[in-house]
């Protein structure tokens, strides 16, 4: 081999090494302002008190809804097509008919008001949240836990799991005080009047909300956008977050993606025998995701355009939202006539979630979170490459949209204390499998507490 060839090979190896270092090195935590004003106009003095809130929708809104439901125009579905093209029209007719003739909003409204609701102004926006304080004996420790929903969900998703997390259970000497906020622009939380409110900025609002309520330290939990927001909270505010639990663990770094590609050559060794099919073959999963991500491209680019149609048509809104509750719960349900919606849910609870979007006119503003989180400026924050040292736990439900191995998660989460492959369930874990999720949260927080106890003991010995 000639000297010139050896030099070229050496240069190539050195170049690859430098490139690998550049794409894998830890990045510093970005400086995110804590007081950005997201309300209309210039910053001003506002009422920062915590105000009790009760859902009480004007009768005119409900009457207008009924008028629209009585005048829905349908397109005949294709022969032999179930949910492959989206929400099947024959199934939609049944949902709309129930909504029009049997769904009683006032009864459902009373159910939603079962727990205390509040609003408070954070950075110019009135933020809504549900706050549940458990009534337990003095020997039971009460731990603050903020649970953050995603799209197209809402705080309604958590109603089944509330009693499971606030009631003492065998083997644990603690329960949770729950704070369930609505993301800005979702439901009863005011939407930003200015561009730029991405998931990272929402994390700042949630941190400020918890401080307003009176918590300096707390645990966080979330799925979908909630998982992105709590990850940002843990990354930016490790002094506040004691531990994070996610039912949609995700990381998107160059090195984690390289690992996934290398893993495709020995999938069972990389992902595990029982999980390899959730990642590989990569081409098959890529096209499946491509099939399901059309909504994301629309919402990340033109949310206001699609929002006009969804805001004006309650039937269209229901179809758009409930199709996700079918396909994201189990992708195989696309081949079922009714999307198997009623296999895990009932129509009233599904419509409760749709109604939160309808009565608050928040479908457009909710979708803007996609547009704001996929801007060049937001992506340039590169939070996935800022290491997160807060104790973390991951509940991997088998029908989640994507599977990520612990090897990949380790790129981001340096203190991953628990990672469980769940026996059943999909994207909407709290709504579909509240019992499984609740138990996983309890076991995770128990490990978090043990982690801090051992850390304190080690520090105590070191100080002697």
From Swiss-Prot:
An individual GO BP term: catabolic process
Subcellular location: Microsome membrane; Endoplasmic reticulum membrane
Keyword Cell wall biogenesis/degradation: no
Active site: 224 (nucleophile), 370 (proton donor), 427 (proton acceptor)
GO CC aspect terms: endoplasmic reticulum membrane
Disulphides: none
Protein name as catalogued: Juvenile hormone epoxide hydrolase 1
Originating species: Ctenocephalides felis (Cat flea)
């Amino acid at each position: 081999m000639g000297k010139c060839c050896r030099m070229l090979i050496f240069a190539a190896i050195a170049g690859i090494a430098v490139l690998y270092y550049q794409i894998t090195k830890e990045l510093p935590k970005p400086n995110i302002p804590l007081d950005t004003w997201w309300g209309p106009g210039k910053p001003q003095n506002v009422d920062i008190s915590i105000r009790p809130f009760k859902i009480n929708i004007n009768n005119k809104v409900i009457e207008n809804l009924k008028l629209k439901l009585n005048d829905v125009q349908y397109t005949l579905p294709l022969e032999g097509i179930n949910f492959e093209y989206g929400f099947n029209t024959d199934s939609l007719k049944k949902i709309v008919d129930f909504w029009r003739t049997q769904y009683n909003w006032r009864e459902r409204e009373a159910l939603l008001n079962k727990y205390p609701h509040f609003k408070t102004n954070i950075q110019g926006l009135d933020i809504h949240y549900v706050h549940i304080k458990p009534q337990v004996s003095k020997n039971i420790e009460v731990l603050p836990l903020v649970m953050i929903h995603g799209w197209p969900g809402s705080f309604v998703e958590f109603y089944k799991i509330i009693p499971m997390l606030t009631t003492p259970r065998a083997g644990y000497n603690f329960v949770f005080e729950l704070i369930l906020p609505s993301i800005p622009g979702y439901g009863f939380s005011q939407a930003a009047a200015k561009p730029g409110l991405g998931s990272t900025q929402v994390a700042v609002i949630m941190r400020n909300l918890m401080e307003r309520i009176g918590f300096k330290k707390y645990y966080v939990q979330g799925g979908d956008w909630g998982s992105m927001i709590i990850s940002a909270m843990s990354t930016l505010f490790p002094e506040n977050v004691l531990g994070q639990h996610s039912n949609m663990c995700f990381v998107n770094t160059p090195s984690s993606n390289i690992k996934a590609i290398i893993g495709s050559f020995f999938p069972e060794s990389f992902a595990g025998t029982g999980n390899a099919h959730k990642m590989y073959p990569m081409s098959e999963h890529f096209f499946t995701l491509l099939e399901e991500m059309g909504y994301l491209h629309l919402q990340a680019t033109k949310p206001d355009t699609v929002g006009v149609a969804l805001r004006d048509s309650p039937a269209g809104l229901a179809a758009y939202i409930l199709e996700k509750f079918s396909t994201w719960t189990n992708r195989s349900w696309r081949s079922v006539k009714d999307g198997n919606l009623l296999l895990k849910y009932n129509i009233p609870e599904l419509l409760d979630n749709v109604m939160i979007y309808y009565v608050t006119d928040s479908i457009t503003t909710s979708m803007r979170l996609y547009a704001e989180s996929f801007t060049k400026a937001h992506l340039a924050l590169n939070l996935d490459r800022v290491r997160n040292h807060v104790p973390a736990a991951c509940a991997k439900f088998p029908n989640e949209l994507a599977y990520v191995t612990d090897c990949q998660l380790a790129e981001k989460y340096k203190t991953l204390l628990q990672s469980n492959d769940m026996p059943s369930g999909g994207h909407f874990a709290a709504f579909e499998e509240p019992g499984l999720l609740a138990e996983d949260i309890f076991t995770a927080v128990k490990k978090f507490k043990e982690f801090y106890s051992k850390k304190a003991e080690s520090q105590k010995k070191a100080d002697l």
